[in-house]
Amino acid sequence: MTVHIHPAVDNGVKKGTGSFAGGTLVCKCSDRPVKVGIKGDVAHNHACGCTKCWKPDGATFSVVAVVPRGNVTVLENGDKLQIVDTSATIQRHACKVCGTHMFGRIENTGHPFYGLDFIHPELFYEQGSAAPEFAAFVSSIIESGVDPAQMPEIRSRLKELGLEPYDCLSPALMDAIAGHIAKTSRKAA
């Protein structure tokens, strides 16, 4: 059985250029596509198994990365954007017509990732952004209907692709969250 992770990585993870200056994310609409400009390269690019992230058809995982909030600009057809779930921590702005999530924004200034917007690098018109580095929330794909018996094979495929599987975020990101919480707790004490 072939394990499909995501079209952007199924045939191998493509390394970034190391000098990606940014580009334009484009939704899947053929008529009046939403276009979002991104300045600079992405960070913490990863395969995500959560049930909230947008995935293209046939993908088991999404591929998602972050960029500084100030580096995101809606360029065209912003009238087609709507927030998918206003109660979610990450406010995912999606095209009302095709459903593609264009960017996710955290509005809670106390959140460890406030100031970072979440994007799907495969939507770049340009090539060369930083490659996925790991896989997060791997067990969560079971919630979206994957048979738990397939998990060893899926984890093996992720490792084969060079995407270390975690059931939370990568250790560096978990350390950043814990550091933020510790710093905030000390201020409150």
From Swiss-Prot:
Name the chemical reaction catalysed here: S-(hydroxymethyl)glutathione = glutathione + formaldehyde
Superkingdom of origin: Bacteria
What keywords were assigned to this record? Answer: Lyase, Metal-binding, Zinc
- A biological process term (GO) from this entry: formaldehyde catabolic process
Tell me the ranges covered by the CENP-V/GFA domain, including all copies.
20-167
Q: What class of enzyme is it?
A: lyase
EC annotation from Swiss-Prot or TrEMBL? 4.4.1.22
Q: What does this protein do?
A: Catalyzes the condensation of formaldehyde and glutathione to S-hydroxymethylglutathione.
Query: What pathway is this protein a component of?
Result: One-carbon metabolism; formaldehyde degradation; formate from formaldehyde (glutathione route): step 1/3
Q: Mind telling me what this protein is named?
A: Glutathione-dependent formaldehyde-activating enzyme
Q: What is the lineage of its organism?
A: Bacteria, Pseudomonadati, Pseudomonadota, Alphaproteobacteria, Hyphomicrobiales
- Record-linked InterPro entries: CENP-V/GFA (IPR006913), Formald_GSH (IPR014185), Mss4-like_sf (IPR011057)
Q: Which cofactor does it need?
A: Zn(2+)
- What would be an example GO MF term here? S-(hydroxymethyl)glutathione synthase activity
